[in-house]
């Protein structure tokens, strides 16, 4: 349906991965549909295969289900030793929630922009150095 002369959104892929599954988009680009326990029921994550290993783009939300999906991927698709980088596009919890866990599991540091780092430091500072709001 078109409204206000806007075209309907068209998706470039007829096939979509099921929750927790990888779909090879093209070459070394793999699409991971990670389920979320909120109204937005999934997030799209990516594994990009390079010459020397894989880059994970975004981690998903910190849930036991998401950790299980990552463990399954490491057991069936890519050895943890083959992961070179973890890139976090932004610090929303659905994109960055498992960055620390993945970093620990893979023994590599996650990367994100300086702006996201600065904003996260501000939030942490507010949480650590301000009094909680009084409750009624």
Regions flagged by a language model, labelled:
Residues 1-12:
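N-terminal presequences and immediately downstream first alpha-helices
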Residues 11-17, 21:
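Short glycine- and acidic-rich boundary segments immediately preceding or forming the N-terminal edge
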Residues 19-81:
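Conserved beta-strand hairpin/beta-sheet module of binuclear metal-dependent hydrolase folds
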Residues 61, 93, 136:
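Short, glycine/acidic-enriched loop or turn micro-motifs at the edges of active sites
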Residues 66-113:
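Active-site metal-binding motif and surrounding structural segment of the metallo-beta-lactamase
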Residues 89, 125-128:
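Long, mid-chain structured domain cores
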Residues 118-123:
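A short beta-to-alpha transition loop/helix N-cap that caps and shapes the active-site region
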Residues 129-134:
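Conserved small/polar residues in nucleotide/adenosyl-binding loops
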């Amino acid at each position: 349906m078109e409204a206000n002369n806007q075209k309907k959104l068209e998706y470039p892929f007829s096939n979509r991965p099921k929750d927790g599954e990888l779909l090879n988009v093209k070459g070394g680009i793999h699409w991971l549909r990670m389920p979320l326990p909120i109204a937005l029921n999934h997030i799209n994550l990516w594994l990009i295969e390079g010459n020397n290993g894989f880059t994970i783009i975004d981690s998903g939300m910190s849930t036991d289900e998401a950790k299980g999906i990552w463990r399954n991927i490491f057991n069936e698709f890519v050895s943890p030793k083959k992961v070179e980088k973890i890139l976090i596009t932004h610090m929303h919890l659905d994109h960055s929630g498992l960055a620390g866990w993945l970093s620990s599991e893979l023994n590599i540091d996650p990367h994100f922009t300086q702006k996201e780092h600065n904003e996260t430091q501000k939030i942490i500072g507010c949480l650590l150095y301000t009094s909680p709001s009084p409750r009624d």
